[in-house]
A protein has these predicted regions:
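DUTPase catalytic domain/fold
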Residues: 1-149
């Protein structure tokens, strides 16, 4: 595992920097900079107070926190969110409360997502008349579960 230098600024001094909970973790926890209340089924775009400058050839992916999803039904609408290397604005996270009955309250400073930094491979798309065959072929949604439990 290598450390990639990511420049960071915050919208105010009290905004916590992203933190890794354990050595070897892929995702660094990011927090909300405001109090948020999500009614059942409600979504909101939540500011984190952090801005980053990624090196060329890298992307930051914003992933849901598994504990927030498991305990409260809160996840990210466009998971994973993509922060391109050229973006310099504040990172925001669009959360949704999938619980049908319970309202969720998040307080300023609560961890709401994980930021994963990855190297990017760009594709060179090549138009062809037909694609080469494969074992899977054109089997789509649910095709690998046919005949199984």
């Amino acid at each position: 595992m290598t450390d990639v230098e990511v420049l960071i600024s915050t919208t105010s001094p009290e905004v916590p920097l992203p933190t890794y909970a354990h050595p070897g973790d892929a995702g660094a926890d990011i927090t909300t900079r405001v109090d948020v209340t999500l009614a059942p089924g409600q979504r909101a775009t939540v500011p984190t107070g952090i801005c980053i400058a990624l090196p060329a050839g890298y992307v930051a992916l914003v992933h849901p926190r598994s504990g927030l999803a498991a305990r409260h039904g809160v996840t990210i609408v466009n998971a994973p969110g993509t922060v391109d290397a050229g973006y310099r604005g504040e990172i925001s996270v669009t959360l949704i409360n999938t619980d049908a009955t319970e309202t969720v309250h998040l307080s300023k400073g609560d961890r709401i997502a994980q930021l994963v930094i990855q190297a990017v491979e760009r594709a060179a798309f090549v138009t062809v008349e037909s694609l080469p065959g494969s074992h899977r072929g054109e089997g789509g949604f649910g095709s690998t579960g046919v005949g199984g439990a």
